[in-house]
């Protein structure tokens, strides 16, 4: 059995890609997209029809050019998501504009709009996850959306404080970023030789997984942002893992036994009182890596969102 099939015995495998053809190849349960992945996919000629449709929609649904571009961007994200859902049996994650990461109300508004666009294409909201950055405002937006039956995927998650606040808000799923945590520590104190058990990104997800299971939180833990297959194999047993096509390929090509590494702890504990905003901000601020990586992640997604807008504006 290849490693990818081995992992699938214990973990739901999700494709981290906007490239519909590569998703088709690996038979994942779900797929996740983000502005960077959409920008990459939008540059491929086989998806031109999805872009043309989004442009036509933008022209029809915006008075100013700025409004048309925003409308086209939203439609493009949904077009890709709807195509992906023809292939995967589960859900697709679609991201709210990263520039709204500190605006709870506008994040809620954008999420509802994306769900509405999906429903106009005949996609039920039970097949959509709305991706929001794990800021205090993003978590509060998700808390409200969950009450409306709109499930959320809280992304750019780097600190334990973020993970705890998400669980306490009752969000559907979190995406702790293994690779970006690893990058930060590797740049400061390179691990040589590499020992996966000591990988700070792997340890972070393991801690969150154990904490959630010990306190009976139902929020799904989906490890994300991997740099190497060792990280993925070390988290086999995690609820879900979202994996880029290049790493899915490596796992599919290697035949070796896969052992479950994450197992729910037998000991359980009562849940603590929910964190206040002040506690959350303080705890998160104590983690220099998380502060830096959350800020950087929001900025990078915003840059790619703007590039996507420029690409569409040129076609309007």
UniProtKB/Swiss-Prot annotation:
GO cellular component, one term: cytosol
GO biological process entries: carbohydrate metabolic process; pentose-phosphate shunt, non-oxidative branch
Reaction(s) catalysed by this chain's protein: D-sedoheptulose 7-phosphate + D-glyceraldehyde 3-phosphate = D-erythrose 4-phosphate + beta-D-fructose 6-phosphate
Active site: 131
Family under the similarity heading: Belongs to the transaldolase family. Type 1 subfamily.
Subunit-structure text: Homodimer.
NCBIfam families linked: PRK12346.1 (NF009001), talAB (TIGR00874)
Listed name of the protein: Transaldolase A
Biological source species: Escherichia coli (strain K12)
Gene: talA
């Amino acid at each position: 059995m290849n490693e990818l099939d081995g992992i699938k015995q214990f973990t739901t495998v999700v494709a981290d890609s906007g490239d519909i053809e590569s998703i088709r190849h690996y038979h994942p349960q779900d797929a996740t997209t983000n502005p960077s992945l959409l920008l990459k996919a939008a540059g491929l000629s086989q998806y031109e029809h999805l872009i043309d449709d989004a442009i036509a929609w933008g022209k029809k649904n915006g008075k100013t050019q700025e409004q048309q571009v925003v409308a086209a961007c939203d439609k493009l994200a949904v077009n890709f998501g709807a195509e992906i859902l023809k292939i995967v049996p589960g859900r697709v994650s679609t991201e709210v504009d990263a520039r709204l990461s500190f605006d709870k109300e506008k994040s809620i508004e954008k999420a509802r709009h994306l769900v509405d666009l999906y429903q106009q294409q005949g996609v039920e909201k039970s097949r959509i996850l709305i991706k929001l950055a794990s800021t205090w405002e993003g978590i509060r937006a998700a808390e409200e959306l969950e009450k409306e039956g709109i499930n959320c995927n809280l992304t750019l998650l780097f600190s334990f404080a973020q993970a705890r606040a998400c669980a306490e808000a009752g969000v559907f799923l979190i995406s702790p970023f293994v690779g970006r945590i690893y990058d930060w520590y590797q740049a400061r104190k390179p691990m040589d030789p590499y020992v996966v058990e000591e990988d700070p990104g792997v340890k972070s997800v393991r801690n969150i997984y154990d904490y959630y299971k010990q306190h009976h939180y139902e929020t799904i833990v989906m490890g994300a942002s991997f740099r190497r297959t060792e990280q993925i194999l070390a988290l086999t047993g995690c609820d879900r893992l979202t994996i880029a096509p290049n790493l899915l390929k490596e796992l599919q090509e290697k035949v070796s036994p896969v052992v479950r590494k994450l197992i729910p702890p037998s000991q359980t504990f009562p849940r603590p009182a929910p964190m206040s905003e002040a506690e959350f901000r303080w705890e998160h601020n104590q983690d220099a890596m998380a502060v830096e990586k959350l800020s950087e992640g929001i900025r990078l997604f915003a840059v790619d969102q703007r590039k996507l807008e420029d690409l569409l504006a040129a076609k309007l």
